[in-house]
Curated annotation (Swiss-Prot):
Record family assignment: Belongs to the class I-like SAM-binding methyltransferase superfamily. RNA methyltransferase RlmE family. RlmM subfamily.
HAMAP family according to UniProt: 23SrRNA_methyltr_M
Assembly description: Monomer.
Active site: 308 (proton acceptor)
Name used for this protein in its record: Ribosomal RNA large subunit methyltransferase M
Coiled coil: none
Superkingdom as given in the UniProt entry: Bacteria
Function description: Catalyzes the 2'-O-methylation at nucleotide C2498 in 23S rRNA.
Gene Ontology MF term list: S-adenosylmethionine-dependent methyltransferase activity
Keyword annotations of the record: Cytoplasm, Methyltransferase, rRNA processing, S-adenosyl-L-methionine, Transferase
A Pfam family reported for this protein in Swiss-Prot or TrEMBL: RlmM_FDX
Subcellular location(s) of the protein: Cytoplasm
Positions bound to S-adenosyl-L-methionine: 191, 224-227, 243, 263, 279
Length: 358
């Protein structure tokens, strides 16, 4: 297998392809990418003797920012109007597919798919296709024998399926990298979902209490009307909301929030807190330096902040901000972990997470 299918936010295909091309080159692997414009899909093809599997063994998905999820591409399978199950079986036989490689399959759609009939077909097709593949020894009979690797079928339309394999230890825990979240009626704004998604992406599920529990203290810079503050309060935190704008009255009535009318970039706490979060729309380098000031000054242990990218050279701007952050953390001689991801609930921004490990 020489090709990988990348999934990203529609409109950011070039950034995702460039990012993987640079990451591969850093490992001594070279290839090229073909974006499927405004579909949130990119085909990345290795140009040398190395396999796509080798590339995925060297590059953890967690280290990528614009790539939400990916899988190894076996090939494009034409789907006839009749007996599509048989067509997939014959395609896999022709590709020398080993049934022990995967124990289950998933059907995928492009994020921009608006064909309800295709969506209904994708859901209903899983059971008969799985049954047919197992009967043909194209799927392992039990999950233990396949180590959790999964056969993927990305339906571009009713005529074509991109068939591939996702690796259990290097794929998103969420379908196509998108957590399915619902906005409670009590949340002041939809931005609440962004912070929730950030926690799900950056924090191991079995360590939620370690990071978020125990009555922690937090600061929300640029808080109004209170979407991120609301999420912090839901975790039982005492929150200082810093913003010159008005906060949601119901949120203030919880007794967990102190509203400070001040400039989020200038204000600093008298004592260190556990969390600092910031969703201020401003120049990304300014926000990156703000986060460095908080972490470097040991004003917080954890921070989640957004970097608003420009309309042009978005990937290049992220690289500049990344270097600012990494260099600043190194100069502060702090043991920290930096992660970033273009979340589903992000638009023209990316979300960063820094935690102090000392």
């Amino acid at each position: 297998m020489q090709q990988i299918m990348l999934m990203c936010r529609p409109g950011f295909e070039t950034e995702a392809g460039q990012e993987l091309m640079d990451s591969a080159a850093a490992c001594g692997l070279f290839g090229y990418f073909q974006p499927i414009r405004n579909a949130g899909l990119v085909r990345f093809t290795l140009g040398g003797p190395e396999s796509a599997f080798e590339l995925m063994q060297r590059i953890p998905l967690d280290e990528l920012v614009f790539v939400r999820d990916w899988f190894l591409v076996i090939g494009d399978c034409p789907l006839p109007a009749r007996d599509r199950v048989g067509a997939v079986i014959e395609f896999l036989r022709g590709a020398d597919w080993q049934g022990s490689l995967a124990s289950r399959l998933e059907t995928r759609l492009t994020e921009t798919n608006e064909d309800r009939d295709l969506g209904n077909f994708a859901r209903k097709w899983v059971a008969p296709l799985s049954r047919g593949l197992r009967e043909a020894d194209m799927l392992a009979q039990d999950s233990a024998s396949a180590k959790g690797d999964r056969l993927e079928l990305l339906l571009l339309d009713f005529e074509t399926a991109v068939v591939g394999l996702s690796l259990a230890d290097n794929r998103s825990p969420f379908p196509q990298g998108i957590p399915r979240l619902r906005l409670p009626a009590s949340a002041p704004s939809r931005s609440a979902l962004k912070l929730e998604e950030a926690w799900k992406v950056f924090i191991p599920e079995d360590r939620y209490l370690d990071y978020l529990g125990g009555g922690r203290k937090a600061v929300d810079l640029g808080a109004a009307p209170g979407g991120w503050t609301w999420q912090l309060v839901q975790q039982g935190m005492m929150v200082t909301a810093v913003d010159n704008g008005p906060m949601n009255p119901e949120l203030m009535a919880t007794g967990h929030v102190e509203h400070v009318r001040a400039d989020g970039y200038a204000w600093r706490p008298k004592r260190a807190v556990d969390w600092m979060v910031c969703d201020i729309v401003d120049k990304p380098r300014k926000t990156a330096r703000l986060a460095l000031d908080w972490v470097g000054g040991k004003l917080c242990r954890y921070t989640v902040f957004n970097l608003k990218l420009p309309m042009k050279k978005r990937y290049e701007e992220w690289l500049i901000c990344r270097d600012i952050l990494l260099q600043g953390l190194a100069e502060a001689e702090l043991n920290c972990r930096l992660r970033a991801r273009h979340l589903y609930h992000d638009r023209e921004e990316i979300t960063c997470f820094i935690e102090r490990l000392d």
